[in-house]
C-alpha cells in the first residue's frame, strides 16, 4: 500500500513543476506516478490469493526491505529529471532522505533544478520520518528491539505489548499518529511563515525539521535568524520523548512530563554538553586575557544549545 501512496504523491511535485512551466519535470513525475500505480496493481493482482497474516518477524523483514525498494521508486523521477545524475546516486539520495539521514549527494538547491525536485526530496524525508515512527510503535515495540520499551517495566504483566492487540496494529497506529504528524508540521509551517520565511521555503523547513532529516533547504534571512531558530527549537521538544504523543498507545506512559526518563536524560545531556562548551569558551578568553563580550557569549551559548539539541533528536 505504501508503494501506491508514494506513487500517487508524485502528483504533487508534478503540479508544482507545471505551475513553474517546467513541463519536462512535470511529465516525468506524472509518468512515474502512473508507472508506479500500474506496477502496484500488477503486484496486488498477483498476490490477491495469498491470505496469510504476517507475524511480527515477517513485518520486521518487510520494514527493512521497504528501505531498499521504496527509495528505488522515489529515485525514478529524480534520475529522469537530471541528465548528469546516475541512478545509483539518485537512489542513494532518496535512501538518505527516506531514512532521514540527511546525507546530500545531489545539490538540489540551485535555481536550475526547480522547486519540484526540492519538494520531492523533502517529501521523501517527511514520509520516511512518519513511516519509521509508525513502524517503531507497531512493529519494533512488540519485538522489544527499539528504545520504545523504556518504562515498559511499569506494565502489570511485565511486557510492552497490550494483550488486546488489534488485528492490524500498523493501521491502528497510523490512524492515531498521522493526524498528529500533520498538525505539528502545519503548525511549524505557519509559524515560520509568520516569522518572515516565504510559504514554500517554510514548508520545506517544516518537513525537514519534523522528520529530523537534517536537510537545509534554504539559507535563512540573517535578520530573522534567531526568531526562526527559536521557533524550530520549540518543535525539537516533540522529538525528545514518545510520551508527548503516544499516551493512548502505551498505557505505561501515563505520567507527568517532568517524570519522564527520556525528558530528564535529554535535559541532562543538553545542559551538560552546552555547559562544557561554554566553560571552554570562557576559559579560553581568560587565558588569552581577552575581555568577555556577553553578546557574543550569549550567541555562542545559544548556538551550542541549539546544535546539541538538534543532534540529540536525530539519535
Where are these regions (language model features)?
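Membrane-proximal intracellular helices of multi-pass ion channels
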Residues: 1-315
Amino acid at each position: 500500500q505504501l508503494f501506491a501512496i508514494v506513487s500517487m504523491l508524485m502528483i504533487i511535485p508534478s503540479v508544482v513543476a507545471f505551475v513553474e512551466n517546467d513541463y519536462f519535470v512535470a511529465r516525468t513525475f506524472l509518468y512515474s506516478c502512473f508507472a508506479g500505480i500500474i506496477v502496484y496493481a500488477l503486484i496486488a493482482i498477483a498476490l490477491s490469493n495469498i491470505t496469510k497474516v504476517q507475524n511480527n518477524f515477517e513485518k520486521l523483514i518487510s520494514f527493512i526491505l521497504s528501505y531498499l525498494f521504496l527509495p528505488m521508486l522515489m529515485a525514478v523521477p529524480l534520475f529522469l529529471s537530471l541528465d548528469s545524475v546516475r541512478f545509483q546516486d539518485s537512489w542513494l539520495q532518496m535512501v538518505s532522505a527516506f531514512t532521514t539521514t540527511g546525507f546530500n549527494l545531489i545539490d538540489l538547491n540551485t535555481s536550475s533544478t526547480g522547486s519540484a525536485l526540492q519538494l520531492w526530496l523533502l517529501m521523501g524525508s517527511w514520509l520516511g520520518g512518519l513511516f519509521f515512527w509508525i513502524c517503531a510503535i507497531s512493529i519494533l515495540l512488540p519485538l522489544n528491539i527499539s528504545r520504545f520499551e523504556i518504562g515498559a517495566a511499569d506494565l502489570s504483566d511485565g511486557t510492552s505489548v497490550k494483550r488486546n492487540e488489534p488485528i492490524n496494529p500498523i493501521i491502528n497506529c497510523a490512524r492515531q499518529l498521522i493526524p498528529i504528524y500533520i498538525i505539528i508540521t502545519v503548525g511549524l509551517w505557519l509559524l515560520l511563515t509568520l516569522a518572515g520565511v516565504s510559504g514554500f521555503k517554510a514548508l520545506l523547513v517544516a518537513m525537514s525539521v519534523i522528520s529530523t532529516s537534517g536537510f537545509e533547504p534554504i539559507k535563512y534571512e540573517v535578520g530573522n535568524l534567531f526568531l526562526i531558530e527559536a521557533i524550530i527549537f520549540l518543535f525539537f521538544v516533540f522529538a525528545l520523548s514518545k510520551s508527548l504523543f503516544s499516551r493512548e498507545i502505551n498505557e505505561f506512559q501515563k505520567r507527568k512530563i517532568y517524570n519522564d526518563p527520556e525528558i530528564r536524560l535529554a535535559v541532562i545531556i543538553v545542559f551538560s554538553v552546552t555547559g562544557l562548551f561554554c566553560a571552554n569558551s570562557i576559559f579560553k578568553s581568560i587565558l588569552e586575557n581577552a575581555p568577555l563580550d556577553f553578546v557574543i557569549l550569549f550567541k555562542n551559548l545559544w548556538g551550542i544549545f541549539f546544535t546539541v539539541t538538534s543532534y540529540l533528536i536525530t539519535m
